[in-house]
């Protein structure tokens, strides 16, 4: 039986930093099932006391201490949380103290510093990249491809849209995507809209059985979702990628984070921010 533990990601800001680092660390423990709870904007002692009650309830229910990842700046609020029956990992204290020593400087200990608009010059790049991904989704527009950093190509429902949006949000990458249709495959060549941008193309493919399952959620029992159709499209699009010398990866067993990282490395595209 798989062990179960509760994990809290607690912050006086958005909770993004605590959640991102906490998720990465917990992923290393594959034999433990974690109930993950994000609690942003715990910015008063009253809210912290309410959190202590939640943590203690989880400890009693699980029969084990919850794991707490926090990025709380205020020492008084942290002191309240420390009274809980949880195992606390103070992310700022863990990393900032050694950095202060190395840099011979005091940190600002500012709430929400890494994700605030006022202190983040990348905010508009992020918004523009997301708008670009949405405007150029699914081959809807092709006349802005000259402004794209990347153009993802592949069969319908292989993961192009979420990958484009993730790269936009996380790295400010302007990524368009174009679905290759049965008609495109029958021509045995790239669509005209893509030919002059071949250097920007990256292919996504997927296992036919997985594609069938995804398409059946959208159009059950249709030819579009049949295994025979999915197998045909995947086979033909992979043949097209090889013929046109377009790099591609199979998205079946990778997360959107892994897919995005592999694409950027393969294409040598620099992230606008990190």
UniProtKB/Swiss-Prot annotation:
EC id: 2.7.11.33, 2.7.4.28
UniProt catalytic activity: [pyruvate, water dikinase] + ADP = [pyruvate, water dikinase]-phosphate + AMP + H(+); [pyruvate, water dikinase]-phosphate + phosphate + H(+) = [pyruvate, water dikinase] + diphosphate
Superkingdom classification of source: Bacteria
Entries under InterPro entries matching the protein: Kinase-pyrophosphorylase, PSRP
Binding site for ADP: 154-161
Protein name per the record: Putative phosphoenolpyruvate synthase regulatory protein
Signal peptide residue numbers: none
Keyword presence, Kinase: yes
Similarity comment: Belongs to the pyruvate, phosphate/water dikinase regulatory protein family. PSRP subfamily.
Keywords on record: Kinase, Nucleotide-binding, Serine/threonine-protein kinase, Transferase
PANTHER family: PYRUVATE, PHOSPHATE DIKINASE REGULATORY PROTEIN 1, CHLOROPLASTIC (PTHR31756:SF3)
Species per Swiss-Prot/TrEMBL record: Pseudomonas aeruginosa (strain ATCC 15692 / DSM 22644 / CIP 104116 / JCM 14847 / LMG 12228 / 1C / PRS 101 / PAO1)
Gene Ontology molecular function: any one: phosphotransferase activity, phosphate group as acceptor
Function: Bifunctional serine/threonine kinase and phosphorylase involved in the regulation of the phosphoenolpyruvate synthase (PEPS) by catalyzing its phosphorylation/dephosphorylation.
């Amino acid at each position: 039986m798989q062990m179960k533990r509760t994990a809290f990601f607690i912050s006086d800001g958005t909770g993004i930093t605590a959640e991102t680092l906490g998720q990465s660390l917990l992923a290393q423990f594959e034999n433990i099932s974690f109930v993950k709870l994000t609690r942003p904007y715990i910015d008063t002692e009253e809210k912290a006391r309410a959190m202590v009650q939640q943590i203690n309830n989880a400890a009693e229910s699980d029969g084990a201490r919850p794991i707490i990842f926090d990025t709380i700046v205020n020492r008084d609020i942290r002191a309240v949380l420390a009274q809980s029956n949880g195992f606390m990992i103070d992310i700022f204290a863990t990393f900032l103290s050694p950095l202060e020593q190395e840099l011979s400087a005091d940190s600002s200990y500012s709430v929400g510093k890494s994700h605030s608009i006022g202190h983040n010059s990348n905010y508009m790049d992020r918004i523009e990249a997301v708008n670009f991904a949405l405007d150029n989704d699914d081959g809807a527009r092709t006349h802005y491809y000259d402004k794209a950093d990347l153009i993802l190509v592949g069969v319908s429902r292989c993961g192009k849209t979420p990958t484009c949006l993730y790269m936009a949000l996380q790295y400010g990458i302007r990524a368009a995507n174009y679905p290759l249709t049965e008609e495109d495959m029958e021509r045995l060549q790239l669509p005209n809209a893509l030919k002059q941008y071949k250097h920007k193309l990256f292919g996504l493919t997927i296992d036919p059985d997985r594609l069938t399952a995804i398409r059946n959620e959208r159009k059950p029992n249709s030819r579009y979702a049949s295994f025979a159709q999915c197998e045909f499209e995947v086979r033909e699009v992979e043949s097209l990628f090889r013929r046109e010398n377009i790099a591609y990866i199979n998205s079946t067993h990778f997360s959107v984070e892994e897919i995005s990282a592999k694409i950027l490395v393969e294409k040598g595209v620099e992230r606008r921010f990190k």
